[in-house]
């Protein structure tokens, strides 16, 4: 899959809201309202057209085209919202998108490749990076500057907590 057609998740429909087909969206963008600046798609690349939205506490409450009942809104619960990777704004050299770290090499302080990033999770308390080591062992680490002191587009350097 080329980077032009690669989908990046930037939000999720978390629940129905009210009785008239509105949904609550959890945005992964910063600020959260930036999600409204994109043409959103589901995993099949179907367009999810938002025709009105308001920010309410930590949620974005939206009306989605052709969704007019709570039952229809309930069926969208847990639908991830995507954009194409090329739609993301260009970042300065010292910044990166967390989603772009998936699959890159992990090196130790000596520069040896010891594994790769297998997964990135966020449980609302910060990002967690799952590293799969060359021997197949998987370990999850909090995504902090102490544990990952160097990050490039090709690799990250890890200092596991037992060495800090």
Swiss-Prot record:
Q: Which SUPFAM superfamilies match?
A: PRC-barrel domain, Translation proteins
Q: Does the keyword Nucleotide-binding apply?
A: no
Q: Where in the cell is it found?
A: Cytoplasm
User: Recorded GO terms, molecular function?
Assistant: ribosome binding
Q: What biological-process terms (Gene Ontology) are attached?
A: ribosomal small subunit biogenesis; rRNA processing
An annotated GO cellular component of this protein is: ribosome
Q: Would I find Cytoplasm among this entry's keywords?
A: yes
**What region holds the PRC barrel domain?**
93-164
Q: Which domain of life is it from?
A: Bacteria
Task: Tell me where it mainly resides.
Answer: cytoplasm
Stored Pfam families: PRC (PF05239), RimM (PF01782)
Q: Which UniProt keywords apply?
A: Chaperone, Cytoplasm, Ribosome biogenesis, rRNA processing
Among PANTHER family, the record links this protein to: RIBOSOME MATURATION FACTOR RIMM (PTHR33692:SF1)
* Domain free text: The PRC barrel domain binds ribosomal protein uS19.
Function text? An accessory protein needed during the final step in the assembly of 30S ribosomal subunit, possibly for assembly of the head region. Essential for efficient processing of 16S rRNA. May be needed both before and after RbfA during the maturation of 16S rRNA. It has affinity for free ribosomal 30S subunits but not for 70S ribosomes.
Subunit note: Binds ribosomal protein uS19.
**Family according to the record:** Belongs to the RimM family.
What is the designated name of this protein?
Answer: Ribosome maturation factor RimM
Q: Which gene encodes it?
A: rimM
């Amino acid at each position: 899959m080329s980077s032009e057609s690669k989908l990046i998740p930037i939000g999720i429909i978390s629940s129905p809201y009210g009785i008239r087909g509105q949904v609550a969206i959890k945005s992964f963008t910063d600020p959260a309202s930036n999600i409204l600046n994109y043409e959103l798609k589901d995993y099949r690349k179907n367009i999810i057209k938002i025709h009105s939205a308001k920010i309410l506490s930590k949620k974005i409450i939206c009306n989605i085209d052709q969704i007019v009942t709570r039952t229809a809104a309930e069926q969208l619960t847990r639908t991830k919202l995507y954009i194409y990777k090329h739609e993301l704004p260009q970042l300065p050299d010292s910044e990166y998108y967390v989603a772009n770290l998936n699959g890159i090499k992990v090196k130790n302080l000596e520069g040896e490749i010891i594994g790769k990033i297998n997964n990135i999770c966020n449980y609302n308390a910060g990002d967690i990076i799952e590293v799969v080591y060359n021997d197949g062992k998987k370990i999850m680490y909090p995504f902090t500057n102490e544990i990952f002191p160097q990050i490039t587009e090709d690799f990250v350097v890890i200092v596991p907590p037992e060495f800090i």
